[in-house]
């Protein structure tokens, strides 16, 4: 039989609009025949479970058991051979084949099946058996069309290779690309692991506002909106930090939140304006405790998502099982600058003029608002970002950040101008940021004032003065450590994804042309 559905669904030789028109005609006939989209079928098994339970049985052993099953899914493969046919359906767990002929289900049902298309949702019922080639299959005694597909799927030879289409039509990507389904299953497992470990450590999960009257908790440019009922300007949150610390003030000594943040900034393989973060705060801890705890979280997430802490990322081994190294900013510059073709002496890194010259050589503008009046600590950080950051492949904590770039972090008791802060880098990407929290209300107010001065001088990412947060601190906050982990970047590591859009189900794209 010449079955059109056996041809590749989308090729240069076949016009997609013509295929859609043909399928609409088929749907119209189904509507005339009764219920075109029935909703009264309940599967008894998933494809993967059937393979797990019965793949090991011989053909004879399986036949003796007479195992009756009901399965349903999207038809992704179809072979019609006269009076017999084979097809494969795909459910959320995997794929399974079924066999149909005129005798088993009746010539009318088999005849109707021959006109069904790839992408249609089908239910099948019958006994399990194994083909002569040993493939587990369902011997179909009852077959129904549950949902008609109007658009053809990409053919298996060409797949869905256009990245923009892949991101924009994620539903098609998930249908045809098992790698994408695997990525998002791993993402779900990793987040579940993080949540489980937080709860096991006696943290309480909370939800804080997405709309803020004042943007705060990070240095970033916010999205702005308007609250009609209150007639006031609002900001999509750039970070939940200040609200979570209010909860610590209120007596919830261990809190965490996994949710979205929004930053009205650039899009790149590492940045998406809407992204997922986990932030957590623990009273009576400091940044060293946080580093130990965060290291354990990430290692456990890797094992729970991928079964191992030793991964391969972009062709290179990434070992999360070893202790994460810890370096100061200047130690990291001296250790890694050679990979950027640079060589420095420790004394040079204490010379502000020298660093400004090096920044200019690297294409940075030392007179930009963020650097024009910068102290030595901020300049060292800028040089680190220029010559060392991208080379931090193995997990590395960069510690002891300057106070001028850490307005919410506690200052060191022994090193004036340095805060008890860290950032975690893996494969050259920032994955986490944490510190011993500043709980001195007067010190925090002074730092907010300096941030306002920087904003007035042209730094768009400087923080606002949050009077209510200061009021909260004035009631007293216990010594506290807090950390934020970038979930999307973490998933990139765990799934070997080169682009952040590969791990976000529906990333932002330019408006689609009509």
From Swiss-Prot:
Keywords: Aminoacyl-tRNA synthetase, ATP-binding, Cytoplasm, Ligase, Magnesium, Metal-binding, Nucleotide-binding, Protein biosynthesis. One of its GO terms (biological process) is lysyl-tRNA aminoacylation. It catalyses: tRNA(Lys) + L-lysine + ATP = L-lysyl-tRNA(Lys) + AMP + diphosphate. Binds 3 Mg(2+) ions per subunit. One of its GO terms (molecular function) is lysine-tRNA ligase activity. Mg(2+) 1 binds at residues 423, 430. One of its GO terms (cellular component) is cytosol. SUPFAM superfamilies: Class II aaRS and biotin synthetases, Nucleic acid-binding proteins. The keyword Aminoacyl-tRNA synthetase applies. Its cofactor is Mg(2+). Mg(2+) 2 binds at residue 430. It comes from the Bacteria. It is found in: Cytoplasm. Its main location: cytoplasm. PROSITE patterns: AA_TRNA_LIGASE_II (PS50862). InterPro entries: Aa-tRNA-synt_II (IPR004364), aa-tRNA-synth_II (IPR006195), aa-tRNA-synth_II/BPL/LPL (IPR045864), Lys-tRNA-ligase_II (IPR002313), Lys-tRNA-ligase_II_N (IPR044136), Lys-tRNA-synth_II_C (IPR018149), NA-bd_OB-fold (IPR012340), NA-bd_OB_tRNA (IPR004365). Pfam families: tRNA-synt_2 (PF00152), tRNA_anti-codon (PF01336). Its EC number is 6.1.1.6. PANTHER family: LYSINE--TRNA LIGASE, CHLOROPLASTIC_MITOCHONDRIAL, LYSYL-TRNA SYNTHETASE. Homodimer. Belongs to the class-II aminoacyl-tRNA synthetase family. This is Lysine--tRNA ligase.
